């Protein structure tokens, strides 16, 4: 079973020793159409964007204006209606997929953990990349060479244990951290 979630932030349990936890809000979603093999077309609310294509889908599936986004998910529902969140109550582990924090154009020390050069005694190397290849052979930069560039803002999937699930408020508490900023949007999949 898959669910759409929004990251609330991190906290910790009151027990001794305390456990670091991440809070996720399970988004309200409506199953529009069951597609077979356990998958379904699901509508959810995000922002206020709307165009004629979205309005046509809202009319077709008799949805209110707030449900303006669509996704294909594995669901427990056998028919159209509100998405069933009951499987989360019995779940033990989930796979969480979110975008990591974007860090922009970053140097090799931050992006790839390069050691850098000496900072004193007249050195100019400091945080620079240094040599990126040999001389006549191979006469080019090898593919996959670690260099400065865009860091972060990529999809990452991790597995976490479920600590608790508040079905009334749809808040899922996971052990440990997950990628992404507070308010990040992603999806979870029940593993077992």
Swiss-Prot record:
Pfam families to which the protein is assigned, alphabetical = Ribosomal_L3
Which GO MF terms are attached to this record? Answer: rRNA binding; structural constituent of ribosome
Which cellular component appears as one GO term in the record?
cytosolic large ribosomal subunit
Q: Which InterPro entries match?
A: Ribosomal_uL3 (IPR000597), Ribosomal_uL3_bac/org-type (IPR019927), Transl_B-barrel_sf (IPR009000)
**Keywords (A to Z) from UniProt:** Ribonucleoprotein, Ribosomal protein, RNA-binding, rRNA-binding
Might you name a Gene Ontology BP term for this protein? translation
* Homology family: Belongs to the universal ribosomal protein uL3 family.
Please describe what this protein does.
One of the primary rRNA binding proteins, it binds directly near the 3'-end of the 23S rRNA, where it nucleates assembly of the 50S subunit.
**Subunit text:** Part of the 50S ribosomal subunit. Forms a cluster with proteins L14 and L19.
Recorded hits in NCBIfam families, A to Z, give:
L3_bact (TIGR03625)
Name under which the protein is recorded: Large ribosomal subunit protein uL3
In its UniProt entry, the species of origin is given as: Wolinella succinogenes (strain ATCC 29543 / DSM 1740 / CCUG 13145 / JCM 31913 / LMG 7466 / NCTC 11488 / FDC 602W) (Vibrio succinogenes)
